[in-house]
Amino acid sequence: MNLRPLHDRVIVKRLDNETKTASGIVIPDAAAEKPDQGEVLAIGPGKKDDKGNPIALDVKVGDRVLFGKYAGQAVKVDGQELLVMREEDIMAVVTK
């Protein structure tokens, strides 16, 4: 299934957290916090200004982003859990 977000919405796939600590202790899924980083899979065309022209988003497909713990709406697509969020819910783009 293909998703095309509307307006300033962004589709993000959470990145997996480490399931083992530095000392080798395995963290069970139930105790692990949800990761606050993800990869942008799709972006909408942007909000519209007063004249109806779209305002481009700052993020692009493939960006690694930081977002709040409770940001976005979780959706399941083809067995994969994704987040649909507004661009304003994204706090930063991770650069290497």
Swiss-Prot record:
InterPro entries: Chaperonin_GroES, Chaperonin_GroES_sf, Chaprnonin_Cpn10_CS, GroES-like_sf. PROSITE patterns: CHAPERONINS_CPN10. Coiled coil: none annotated. GO terms for cellular component: cytoplasm. Keywords: Chaperone, Cytoplasm. It is found in: Cytoplasm. GO terms for biological process: chaperone cofactor-dependent protein refolding. One of its GO terms (molecular function) is unfolded protein binding. Its main location: cytoplasm. Pfam families: Cpn10. Heptamer of 7 subunits arranged in a ring. Interacts with the chaperonin GroEL. Together with the chaperonin GroEL, plays an essential role in assisting protein folding. The GroEL-GroES system forms a nano-cage that allows encapsulation of the non-native substrate proteins and provides a physical environment optimized to promote and accelerate protein folding. GroES binds to the apical surface of the GroEL ring, thereby capping the opening of the GroEL channel. Belongs to the GroES chaperonin family. This is Co-chaperonin GroES. It comes from Ralstonia nicotianae (strain ATCC BAA-1114 / GMI1000) (Ralstonia solanacearum).
